């Protein structure tokens, strides 16, 4: 039974992780800037083993006090959505740099750390599927769109250096498009947005020409992957992709959602320049290689895309399909 600290704990992935940790009889502290009210993903959680702390990872005194009392630390705090990254690149970078700075200064060898990185660090790397050891190609510094990827990659470098220099047990997971119940469509995630449009009976909007491809990982699979990495010491000091290898174009995704909800709905193609701020750049293909995590832990994703879409739809419609 471990004492676990989860930053970004009220978020989409964090709330699912916390539910699982509590089911496994761990004590959990969630740190998040979100207020504690009925819109919080954890509001209905009732457990004497759970504590919620409203605050920021940039509050060094608060964060360090929570670090020192934890056995396991899950660093999930991040800026969500490409639009928000472009609008606030400095805040985006600070969220990552601040928490890693305090981890490097405070963490001890008796603790274990999971860092939630992102497929964004692969940038413009034109290879498919993407393997963890590839050389990485990011966009030009003048494009604010790359602030998230650069700050996440810097955090990876610092944490892996911490492992090499001080032998702090840690692992890095690069998430690829995690989806599922509780995901907030306000941050621009494509599946909850398309499903919400379909439920409302309005045209489904696809940005660009729709040929860009992605793969989508159910949040329960992502939680399983995190725990499999944290529970296996042979994974320490390395980076692992976490995702699903089932690739689909965004246009075909919209077609699939239309067929699922209402085949009569229109699909509208919208140019990027009509909806995205200056500095946006699209990535045409992003699909993970999952061989490494399977080799080290035996983990592989269980949910197929059709199952994931149904699960998201049930959540959005109040469990009625």
Residue ranges and their predicted role:
Residues 222, 226, 242, 253, ...:
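Non-catalytic, hydrophobic alpha-helical segments
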Residues 232-277:
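Mid/C-terminal beta-alpha module of Rossmann-like enzyme folds, strongest
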Residues 153, 169, 178-192, 202, ...:
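Glycine/proline-rich active-site loop of Rossmann-fold NAD(P)-dependent oxidoreductases
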Residues 17, 226-230, 254-257, 309-316:
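Hydrophobic "lid"/C-terminal helical patch
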Residues 3, 304-321:
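Amphipathic terminal alpha-helices
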Residues 1-176, 312-315:
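N-terminal Rossmann-like NAD(P)+-binding domain of SDR-like oxidoreductases, especially those catalyzing
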Residues 58, 87, 95-98, 185-189, ...:
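Residue-level signal for the nucleotide or nucleotide-sugar donor/cofactor binding architecture
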Residues 219, 273-300, 304, 311:
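Conserved C-terminal active-site "lid" loop/helix of NAD(P)H-dependent oxidoreductases
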